[in-house]
Amino acid sequence: MYVIGITGGVGSGKSYAAHRLQEKLGATLLIADELGHVVMEPGRSAYCQIVEHFGQNIVSSDGSIDRVALAEIVFSDARARDWLNQVIHPAVIEYIRDTIRQNRTRSGILLIETALMYETGCDSLCDEVWLVYVPEEE
């Protein structure tokens, strides 16, 4: 499996480009933002750490993390946000790494879409990285 990273700034069209490539090439697509939610599900790698750190008040009646309650905390406290990012980003990278390991011998293309390609080290998992760039309007 050949791994292509797709990155770009907010509003650059990276999601559009990734979805078009998925459609045209029949590629598998991993979206880091969505994986951030996956790794917070009960039984997943980041769930226990997050609940232990922030407490039961962020747990919904169904046992999942109440993302609205968590957002209220992390968007009003930079230290809490930094802590959460230090848990989520490595968990997402590990999820991607596991997916690559499981599929490495298969043919085809795996696309990884993330705005934080280099900041998280995700680029090291890719065979190549494509940047989607749109210049600012003047």
Q: Predicted regions span which residues?
A:
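Hydrophobic anchor at the beta1->P-loop junction of P-loop NTPases
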Residues: 4-6
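P-loop (Walker A) phosphate-binding loop of NTP-binding proteins
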Residues: 9
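ATP-binding Walker
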Residues: 12
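Walker A/P-loop
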Residues: 15
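Short beta-strand-centered segment that lines the nucleotide-binding/catalytic pocket of NTP-utilizing
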Residues: 27-40
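ATP-dependent small-molecule kinase phosphotransfer cores
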Residues: 37-108
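ATP-dependent NMP and nucleoside kinases share a basic, alpha-helical "lid"
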Residues: 95-105, 109-138
